[in-house]
Amino acid sequence: MLSISNLKELSFLVYGLGITGQSVVKFFKKNKIKNFTVWDDNKKLFQSNRAKNLNEVLNKVDFIILSPGISDIKKKNLNKFNSKIITDIDLFFLTNKNFKSVVVTGTNGKSTTCKLISHLLKKNKFKVLLGGNIGTPILDLKITKDVYVVIEASSFQLSHSKYIQPDYAILLNITNDHLDWHGNLMNYMNSKLKIFKSQKKNQFALINGKLEKIFKKRNFFSKLVVPKEKIYKKIKYKIKNHYLKSNINNENMSFTYTFSKLLKISKKSFISSMSSFVGLPHRYEIFLKKKNVIFINDSKATSFESAKYALSNSKNVYWILGGKPKKNDKIFLSGIKKNIIKCYVVGKNIKFFQSQIQNKISYSIAKNQKKALIKILNEIKLSDVKENTILLSPAAASYDQFINFEKRGDEFKKLSKFYARKFI
């Protein structure tokens, strides 16, 4: 651990002034750490403390705190300074003590699992804070003694982290994602596995069973715990929560249940706590039911692996698909195409998605959500199917038409409510 007085003897470059970078600057100013400079390609973002000669600063500083949004450090000529690069989460672990940390990562389910664990802790009278990639930047949190800090860590953050040492490190899953950022699956996997690298023998590693062999080969020191879905399923029926009844949350819940047992939270308390949990928006969000139609917003599904969960857990689906596809993503429909009545392709990459689904399922080109919904609702009016599902689960990023998945999901909900009144 480093004290604030130790930090004052070191020099820093804050590279990238997005939300994370601005949080680091705020942390330095609050603690009267003056020996720092900043750099961002957008010269309008920050004028004071700005590096005048970037190469000179890179060579002189002790640490470079890199924004998680900066992908290719080679293009930025930063790779030769890799030993100096750290992240805001490193700074958090280096400067805080007397707290318990739960760091969650994985391709799918990070945010939901963080919220589940945070909710569980609050309901069982633990002091808890939630931050990192979800909500509050980690350095903005006010740490008090014995507080549990639940941190969502993305692969971008972990890729350059060196000092993360969680009491409970959770790796939910790894599938093809962010390969445009990491280059290949092995780099992506290695960034996720860094969550365990600095753990001690008295700390816990909760890991997906499919990754157990890889974990053991790396000779990590922490106590390995592999959650079992079949154990969670024995109590699942007792949880009175419609959102958690779906199989889509089985993995998130099995990790949360395993974590609860490590803290010796009783089964009864776990069941009671989970019954009051409210799910996050844009994650298999059932937001409207009208007559024989269920509307589900799963805008957070930015890869097919994510969308597959929603398709597997829905019936008679009118599926809205499309956006900016992830690198090397493939659509495999075996085992789930029976759930799909028809697919509606939207966005600016129609040819890509068309090539993935043609000759597999019935589909229509709709270009945007509005046109898709009008087509779907007209077809439902002519259908004799008793219960229909309109599912936005795009299997792609939103950036072709929206600034983020939240805006995409909000637009879908707004349009759905409007056209449901007109057609149903």
Tell me what each language-model feature is.
Residues 1-103, 275, 281-285, 366-382, ...:
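Short, basic phosphate-binding NTP loop
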Residues 3-11, 23-27, 31, 127, ...:
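Nucleotide phosphate-binding/pyrophosphate-handling subdomain across enzymes
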Residues 10, 26-29, 56-61, 68-205, ...:
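Phosphate-binding loop of NTP-binding sites
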Residues 19, 108-112, 250, 301:
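Residue-level detector of alpha-helix initiation sites
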Residues 28, 64, 104, 133, ...:
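Residue-level signal for inorganic ion chemistry
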Residues 36-41, 205-209, 320-322, 339-348:
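Short internal beta-strands
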Residues 39, 152, 171-173, 390-395:
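Short beta-strands and strand-loop turn motifs
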Residues 329-387:
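C-terminal helical cap/extension that packs against the catalytic core
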